[in-house]
Amino acid sequence: MGLGLIMPVLPTLLRELVPAEQVAGHYGALLSLYALMQVVFAPVLGQLSDAYGRRPVLLASLAGAAVDYMIMASAPVLWVLYIGRLVSGVTGATGAVAASTIADSTGEDSRARWFGYMGACYGAGMIAGPALGGMLGGISAHAPFVAAALLNGFAFLLACILHKETHRSHGGTGKSVRIKPFILFRLDDALRGLAALFAVFFIIQLIGQAPASLWVIYGEDRFQWNTATVGLSLAAFGATHAIFQAFVTGPLSSRLGERRTLLFGMAADATGFVLLAFATQGWMVFPILLLLAAGGVGMPALQAMLSNNVSSNKQGALQGTLTSLTNLSSVAGPLGFTALYSATAGAWNGWVWIVGATLYLICLPILRRPFATSL
């Protein structure tokens, strides 16, 4: 939610620090810096949590984020904001630790459901965060940063009281811990056998960057949406996505199994993309949102497939690798999809959705292969 809080006002804050013509460039650079730091540090935090436990890593990250947001709230010069975003990328790379906590605390038959709940929480944060950030931004461009600091501080206190250690095999060995920040490019032996599934994970995350980067532009160009309609569509997507991940993923995985649930999600998302490409009226998008939300059940199922193939003492490394792949897609995806959109919009601006749907076909031969469980 902290990221969602500051996104609406970050350009406004930049206008206080740099000339107007430089705002867009610095805005893009700050987003890329945040994502790149998560690419590097998500596996580091995951490995640290394997070695020392989930709780201390999570607490340190929450405390660091609270201090960092408060510093950014009072950033007097541009370089302080850059340092702040760099630190935010590091302290915000705790998705791997949270996912590892779920893997520690659940059995193989219920992990997909709990990963779905986690995805729903992210979705809820990305609905409430921008809405609250926009309102606070009307008071001051600095107010959302203060709110983000307070929320992280509150989360730190809650975690101190409520969060119990879930990783039982850490600490007390006296052995040095070897951290591999670039584990994404040199996989641990225990993860190397899952390289094909990692490729599927990356492709699906990459496809997800199409709506993330082009939803507003496409709505304005194709349907002449105004700001209010764009906001309504984003809220509707976030709400339906959260509902499907929270309440559909678990029962569907129990009924179909993780692999078939993943295939169902891919098919739903691809169908939604194709329909979106050919939609001619803005109202058509809203029923299509149900297909896109149904597509969201695939990712928790894939996370469960991967988690079930890794031993308990490698869950942090696994989740760190997945988080790095997610953040790598958030760097590459917007660049690729926006370039494709710019190149084809003059002829027909639906090509980006057709390409996104077609990318799913790459995953099908990989998913036909058998994968062991509980390696």
Predicted regions and their residues:
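Juxtamembrane intracellular "pre-TM" segments in multi-pass secondary transporters
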Residues: 164-200
